[in-house]
Structures are given as structure tokens and as C-alpha cells.
Amino acid sequence: MLHNHRKKIDKLDITLIDLLEKRFKITKEIMNLKDTAKIPRTDSLREHEIIEDLQKKSKLDKDFVEKLMKLIFKEAKNA
């Protein structure tokens, strides 16, 4: 029983990482487009809107969602 749950968690972890890799790839493309257009790479308003929207849609703790997304935004800019 425990083993089965751990296998499910392992699969979910792989999916999370795969999705983050895809997100970071798209973010890099967006950064390149912004650089070409000479517009700021960071859009704090958009980031705030994303966090608020996810907090409304998620059953997770709002502070956790904010911390997670801020970490994702930060890492995406460095990817």
C-alpha cells in the first residue's frame, strides 16, 4: 500500500518537473521576444495577477501558492 502511494508520488514529481521545464522554455522564448522588442523582461503586475488568480482557483494555502509562484518566476528568469 505504502509502496503504491510512493510510486504515484514519484510519477507526479516527474510530471511536475516536466511541466516546469516546459514552462521555463516558454519563459525563455518570451524573454527573447521582450529583448528584441526592447521591453522590460519583468512584468510585476502580470506576476501579481497570476498569483491572485491561482490563489482563487487553488485549494492550497494562499501563502504557499504565492511563495511557490515567486520561486517559479525567479527560477524561470534564470533558466
Language model feature labels by segment:
Residues 1-79:
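Domain-level signature for soluble enzymes in the chorismate/prephenate branch of the shikimate pathway
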